[in-house]
Regions:
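Short, solvent-exposed loop/linker segments at the N-terminal edge
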Residues: 165-173
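Short, exposed beta-strand "edge-strand" segments with a Pro/Gly-rich flavor and a Y/T-containing core
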Residues: 33-35, 142, 167-168
Length: 176
C-alpha cells in the first residue's frame, strides 16, 4: 500500500509470494546526517481492506469484509471476515517490527457506509543517520476465526493469543 513518512526517512518496499502466502516488507531508513525521532502517526502504511457498505446488501455479503485490527506492538494482526461469513477470508500477521496503532481515513460524505482506509502505524522509533528498521507481515487466506489463529501461530513464532470469557471484571468476579 501507500506509505507516508517524514522528510529524511526513505522507505523501500518489497513483496514476494510463496504459494498462497504474500510477504510484504517495508524498510525505513534515516537518510539525513541528524537523528530522527518519530511519534505514533508520523509513519503510515495504508492497508485498504474492503470494509464498506456502498454496493448494496447482496454484494456486500461476498465482496466486502469486517476488519478486525489488533496493533499490539510486536504481536499485531488484521483479521478480515467476509460479511456473509463464507470463506475464504483474508488475514495479516506481523512477523517483524512493531505496530502501535492504526487510524482510519474516510470520506465523511459517505457517512457510516464507508469505514475508510485503514492506516497501520509502526511504533515510534529513534533513528541515527543511516539507521533503518523494518516492518514485515504475511498475508494469507483462512476459513474463519479458529483457522485464522491456527495459521497465525504457524506463520509467526512470536504470536500469543490472549482470550478471556470477559475482558472487564468487577471486584469479586473470577477470571476464567
Amino acid at each position: 500500500g501507500t506509505v507516508k513518512c517524514p522528510k529524511g526517512i526513505s522507505v523501500k518496499k518489497t513483496s514476494s509470494q510463496s504459494g498462497d502466502i504474500i510477504r510484504e516488507r517495508y524498510t525505513f531508513m534515516n537518510t539525513t546526517d541528524k537523528d530522527i525521532f518519530t511519534s505514533l502517526k508520523d509513519i503510515s502504511i495504508y492497508t485498504p481492506f474492503n470494509d464498506d457498505y456502498t454496493c448494496g446488501a447482496k454484494a456486500c455479503m461476498t465482496t466486502k469484509c469486517h476488519t478486525h485490527i489488533w496493533c499490539g506492538e510486536n504481536i499485531s494482526y488484521v483479521m478480515c471476515l467476509r460479511m456473509g461469513g463464507e470463506a475464504p477470508h483474508l488475514g495479516l500477521v506481523l512477523t517483524e517490527g512493531s505496530l502501535s496503532g492504526y487510524s482510519v481515513e474516510r470520506d465523511f460524505e459517505k457517512i457510516s457506509n464507508d469505514r475508510g482506509d485503514f492506516i497501520l502505524h509502526p511504533s515510534p522509533v529513534a533513528l541515527v543517520p543511516n539507521e533503518s528498521f523494518t516492518i514485515e507481515w504475511k498475508l494469507f487466506w483462512h476459513n474463519g476465526k479458529d483457522d485464522f489463529y491456527s495459521k497465525v501461530n504457524q506463520l509467526c513464532n512470536r504470536f500469543i493469543n490472549v482470550s478471556a470469557e470477559n475482558f472487564v471484571l468487577f471486584s469479586g468476579e473470577n477470571i476464567n
